[in-house]
Amino acid sequence: DYQDVDPLFGTLADFDAMVARAHELGLRILVDLVPNHTSDQHRWFQAAIAGAEGSAERAFYHFKEGRGEHGELPPNNWVSMFGGPAWTRITNPDGTPGQWYCHLFDSSQPDLNWENPAVQEAFEGILRFWLDRGVDGFRVDQPHAMGKAAGLPDHPDVERAGAGFIEGEPSPPMWFQESVHPIFRRWRQILDSYPGDRAMCGEAYVLPLSFMALWVRADEFHQTFNFRFLDSEWRPQILFNSINESFEAFDAVGAPSTWVLSNHDIIRHATRMGGE
């Protein structure tokens, strides 16, 4: 649920109290936003699998007919980040095999259809919900995965790239699509319409850095994670080159670089680099 707190951690009232106390202490609160996919337990997806083919509910996600004589094969050759096809077939209410849905990550994380204006409108409401509660911004998970090439075509080089991408080569059909930038510009307008300083940081695994810089232009994200720096070996010359490349790329668009050394996907640097 994008508009509630997991009961494991408390209630919305607890959240409001935390935000108020944090602000008293001069701290800022960013909400972690996951826009590429929902849980398969989310009411939107439950409505989608209960809905008919071609319904408005299914249009929230990427549902397609399978290939093969009986639709038994995935709709395209995309690979999940966790292995295997990026597609799972549902079972219809009458027990017959149904359509397939796209999930770039786990099968329990169906990808939303960001070409659908209803999805865009829903998330604008989610942003406002948290901004109205006083949060200072958002850390946006996997924004580079939101857009998909029209028609969801096969990956032309899946044998080499797998579920990822090859730096310096054309973007694969499931990553880095230009269609996401108008969405981020609209989000930035929403943040800028609120008083005070609000920030939007993207966990966008986009390389090279000159390409990543396009995501932090003045009307899009305020910052992105600097994965070039995060992935750099802990050697002086490599770090020196990474820092210089970062300044050059981000200065070109008037944005600050970030100096992140670990996150929830990367072992903490004290352990990774600390040795004894």
Identify the residue ranges that each predicted region occupies.
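Active-site and adjacent substrate-binding regions of carbohydrate-active enzymes
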Residues: D1-E276
